[in-house]
């Protein structure tokens, strides 16, 4: 009985449960999953202004880029109980010392945070397809001597 909604300002398709207002999707959904590229438009999509719209006890998943979500705000939301949990395979300032990262510290303390490496697409099948594609590309374009 799960209902799936989505927000994309660039897609207009009546087949889907599209919500046209980003803050409305924050209010409506129990699980928010972000799958966007990083741009000026998507930088800190979750921020100090719109965190209040998020459904209490929501779970947030970010598999995009770390900068999509303002980590400072997420850390505060998890600590206060506003957000029930956060899962990500990316963090802001990914090249900084993770020992000083408050989000990493929440995970270490068992505060409903999961952080994994950004390699979900690196399955055996995906890697094999890349190998085949690249081999065919090099052979077809005479790039192998």
Go through the PLM ranges and name each one.
Residues 1-56:
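Rossmann-like dinucleotide/phosphate-binding beta-alpha-beta segment
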Residues 57, 64-145:
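Rossmann-like dinucleotide-binding domain for NAD(H)/NADP(H)
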């Amino acid at each position: 009985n799960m209902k799936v909604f989505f927000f994309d300002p660039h897609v207009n398709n009546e087949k889907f449960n599209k919500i046209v207002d980003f803050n409305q999707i924050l209010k409506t959904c129990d699980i928010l999953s972000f799958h966007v590229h990083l741009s000026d438009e998507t930088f800190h999509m979750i921020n100090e202004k719109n965190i209040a719209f998020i459904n209490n006890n929501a779970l947030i998943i970010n598999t995009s880029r770390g900068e999509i979500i303002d980590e400072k705000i997420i850390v505060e939301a998890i600590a206060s109980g506003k957000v029930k949990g956060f899962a990500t395979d990316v963090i802001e300032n990914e090249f900084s010392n993770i020992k000083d990262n408050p989000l990493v510290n929440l995970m270490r303390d068992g505060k409903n945070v999961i952080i994994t490496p950004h390699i979900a697409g690196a399955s055996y099948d995906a890697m094999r397809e890349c190998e085949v594609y690249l081999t065919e590309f090099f052979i077809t374009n005479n790039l192998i001597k």
